């Protein structure tokens, strides 16, 4: 078994390849490393010269033309925002800044400041023009970020490259919370994957997205605040067991796991509208 680790997009990527010569495996890993770093230069909120930072700085002044790939991601975000009734919203960035989740200077803001910040949150403030891939922000202070979907998008691009290279079996993991199992190791029915509750599942040609706040939170005056904010209220979502979503598309699994953590009542809508996904909020028996 070959395995490779590298950092990109603020997380650790891991690639497992069960077959092939070491030189070939290293070449495959190099292709994926290059791709994730290319995406980081496009999507990062923390690189001042990224495409996203340029968009955030200028799109409220005039329409900005973006690459078709980025425009496709924005269209996906728009669709998921509608599907989840606003629980998934990449314009949440002003709220993330307000609570200190961007600069790591954590604080609990007052209700009036939260209400004011909410005026700059909402995908309806991001106007998309497909003819030319133009993007315009309706208000100054609107900011996009892809923390709830970017890892899934990156994993999806990695899987695309693996298939182009003819790789029959691989596991691509982004941060332990978003992964895709391509094929299966020789002699196995799938890739054995451990869930946060300690149980294991077998995945084959499937993606997994997991969301929870057990690892990222802060406390103020004895009150615990998780890092997953509800873009509809401006406050952290109530702490609850992790949510796992299994499906064909790692992008969907990444985004929907976050949305369902924020609003569990959306589960029936997701099951109806996205027949290729399986959802568990209890984390037991998923995919067995």
Features from the language model and the residues they span:
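Mature catalytic core of soluble alpha/beta enzymes
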Residues: 1-288
């Amino acid at each position: 078994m070959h395995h490779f680790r590298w950092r990109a997009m603020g997380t650790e990527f891991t690639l497992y390849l069960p077959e092939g010569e070491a030189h070939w495996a290293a070449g495959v890993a190099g292709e994926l490393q290059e791709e994730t770093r290319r995406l980081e230069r496009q999507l990062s909120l923390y690189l001042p010269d990224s495409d996203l930072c340029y968009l955030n700085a200028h799109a409220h002044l005039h329409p900005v033309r973006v690459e078709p790939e980025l425009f496709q991601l924005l269209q996906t975000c728009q669709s998921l925002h509608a599907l989840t009734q606003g629980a998934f919203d990449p314009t949440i960035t002003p709220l993330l800044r307000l609570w200190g989740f961007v600069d790591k200077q954590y604080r609990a803001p007052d209700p009036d400041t939260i209400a004011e910040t909410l005026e700059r949150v909402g995908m309806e403030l991001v106007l998309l023009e497909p003819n030319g891939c133009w993007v315009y922000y309706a208000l100054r202070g609107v900011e996009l970020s892809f923390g709830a979907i970017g890892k899934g998008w990156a994993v999806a691009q990695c899987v695309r490259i693996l298939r182009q290279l003819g790789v029959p079996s691989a596991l691509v993991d982004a941060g332990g919370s978003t992964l895709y199992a391509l094929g299966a190791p020789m002699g196995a029915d799938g890739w054995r994957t451990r869930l946060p509750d300690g149980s294991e599942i077998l995945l084959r040609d499937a993606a997994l997205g997991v969301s929870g706040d057990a690892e990222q939170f802060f406390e103020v005056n004895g009150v615990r605040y998780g890092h997953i904010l509800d873009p509809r209220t401006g406050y952290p979502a109530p702490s609850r067991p992790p949510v796992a979503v299994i499906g064909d598309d790692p992008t969907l699994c990444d985004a929907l796991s976050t949305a369902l953590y924020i609003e569990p009542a959306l589960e029936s809508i997701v099951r109806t509208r996205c027949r290729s996904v399986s959802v568990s909020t209890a984390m037991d028996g998923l995919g067995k």
